[in-house]
C-alpha cells in the first residue's frame, strides 16, 4: 500500500501525512494534504482535486 494513501470512515476525519493522496473516503474534516478526499455528495470527484479553501467542497465538484 502506498504510504501516501489513507483510508477513513465515511464522514470521518482524515489523519494522514503531508503527502496524503486520499481516494476512497468521504471526509468532513480535512487535515493537511488530505484535501483530495471527496466530501459527502462528491463520490465521483476526480483524483487529485483540492479543497476550496476551508469549505467542504472539492475543486472538481460542481
Curated annotation (Swiss-Prot):
UniProt-listed Pfam families: Metallothio
Q: Which residues bind a divalent metal cation 6?
A: 38, 42, 45, 61
Q: Which GO terms describe its biological process?
A: cellular response to cadmium ion; cellular response to copper ion; cellular response to zinc ion; detoxification of copper ion; intracellular zinc ion homeostasis
Recorded GO terms, molecular function?
A: metal ion binding
**Which amino acid positions bind a divalent metal cation 4, per UniProt?**
34-35, 45, 49
Q: Where does a divalent metal cation 3 bind?
A: 16, 20, 25
* Residues given in the record as a divalent metal cation 7 binding sites: 51, 58, 60-61
- Give a Gene Ontology cellular component term annotated to this protein: cytoplasm
Supply the alphabetized keyword list. Copper, Metal-binding, Metal-thiolate cluster, Zinc
Which InterPro entries does the UniProt record give? Answer: Metalthion_dom_sf, Metalthion_dom_sf_vert, Metalthion_vert
Which positions bind a divalent metal cation 1? Answer: 6, 8, 22, 25
Q: Mind telling me which Gene3D superfamilies this protein's record contains?
A: Metallothionein Isoform II
Q: Tell me the residue numbers annotated for binding a divalent metal cation 5.
A: 35, 37-38, 51
Q: What does this protein do?
A: Seems to bind zinc and copper. Could play a special role in regulating zinc metabolism during the differentiation of stratified epithelia.
Q: What does the sequence similarity comment in the record state about its family?
A: Belongs to the metallothionein superfamily. Type 1 family.
Name of the featured protein: Metallothionein-4
